[in-house]
Amino acid sequence: MLATMPRSASRLVALALLAACGSDPALVPSEPNKMAADEGGPHGIEEARMNAQEAAAPILAKIQQFAPVELSADLSGLPDSERAALDKLIAAARLMDPILDRQSWAGNPALRDKLSRDGAPLARAKLEYFDIMRGPWDRQDHNTPFATEAPHPAGAGFYPEDMSVDEFKKWIADHPDQRAAFESLTTVIERDSLGLRARPYAEAYKQWLGPAAALLREAAELSQNPTLKTFLRARADAFASDDYYASDKAWMDLDSPVEITIGPYETYEDELLGLKATFEAFVTVSDPKASADLARFKNYLPDMEQHLPIDDVMKTKRGSESPIRVVDLVFTAGDARKSVQTIAFNLPNDEKVRAEKGAKKVLLRNLIATKFNVIMRPIGERVLDPSQQVHLDDQAFFQEVLFHELSHSLGPAFTTVAGQKVDVRLALAGSYSALEEAKADVMGAYNVLYMIERGEFPATMRDKLLVSYFAGLFRSVRFGVEEAHGKGAALQINRLVEAGAATVDPSTGKYKVDLGKIEAAIAALVRDLCTIQHNGDKTAAEALLSKYGQVSPDTQRALDSLTGIPVDVRPYYPVAGEILPK
């Protein structure tokens, strides 16, 4: 890792970077240049410039792990009204960025401003990586600080940094009338002279939600699509009330060439309690034909639930509308543009809406294709036994992504705690996200196999699916085991290896999937994860993640072989006026 390389190696990296950057004097602070000139003339200036570049080299190497890519869509078929509405939606989406910055850490705005005013190469590199990570901690390296000395707060910007879980629970026990507000997805917990208090998002982020709501209403006026109009107006109202129920249902009913997903959704950022949702936005252009081609799978959801390898008491009856949308991204903001870019999502998370209408699965087609070509296939070619690389397949990868999202809507939704029906998310708290991502991954593979059995996919897809699924886990574990998807992927790799479903060649470090054993191992893991969720067993969840959610020496060896392959992509959106760097 560059952060710990010998000085001589670091200087070689600096020389390479210097060659790429040219001799722009703006890259070196003026004061060191002056001092160097006084001491050694041009040679001193060059030495100072080299030292400055050398200091920035480790951060620049981290930045290079995120490949710049252009993501666009064909807008030629959009009516003028929808094209005009699209611009308003992009403007509204941009306002999710300042909210996310504060949700990630209260100190983010001030620190970013400080970095932006410092022209030194190291500060400029830190600023660029700060913008990728959306904060001063490296999400790919156990939240190691790179632009601050402060440790990463588990509660992000949602709670007082000195508040413990015990204090939170005691406050609720002493003030039971405040439980709903404190456990709400859409409140910030603050401390004042009287103690803790829950502040609604609508109040805490009014400075940005107010203008965003106005832009959504303007887009609603421009659009001629009735479902988009209804959703935009309902979501604008929700920004002022924190009641997202009606607008979540309206979002489920969207049938528009232009769509936006905007609001507080995922709780990954809250590593303290797993309660608080971050704001994000996806602005997309739909492909109705591709969506219709996949619509048949939503009709299988009840059958998939019944086919799960778990006791009937663990199975959940949900709404079955569950639309599937194939879209191309034209802009993202907030939590959707932080570090690793999601390739699909399954929303809303509100179990009340899911019980009534199911959940919508949205596949980001242009991003899925880009990641397979830039990252997924190259990883498979490095970590897999050569005899199995022929099974790497973009369509198998696409279906695993789809069925991952479908699987978020399957399995236990509620558990019983002290005689009360409780959302599994609340019962498992900080362990929920990693466990749920692991469940969706492995259950996704389980359900594609079921669709092969039902004749929806050809039998020839089986080996492609199993090998592509396994290789994809290495893509995810590179995100870091401090991140839910990465930790969930590590859990799966370790469980599959333990079951003999994958083996490592000690001489090459390459993995080989045992195509005869992996199906049983997949079913066993689905059963174990669902059992923990059904029982709401936080202790068992923590124990499972502690044992298996780590990078083993063999996995680390495989990851070390991926040098030069991007960890993820860094999107640029030309529709939003962004230009891909040369």
Where do the PLM segments sit?
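N-terminal helix-rich structural modules
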Residues: 44-231
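Extended, compositionally biased alpha-helical segments that mediate assembly or anchoring
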Residues: 526, 530-582
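An active-site-proximal "capping" alpha-helix that borders the catalytic cofactor pocket
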Residues: 225, 433-450
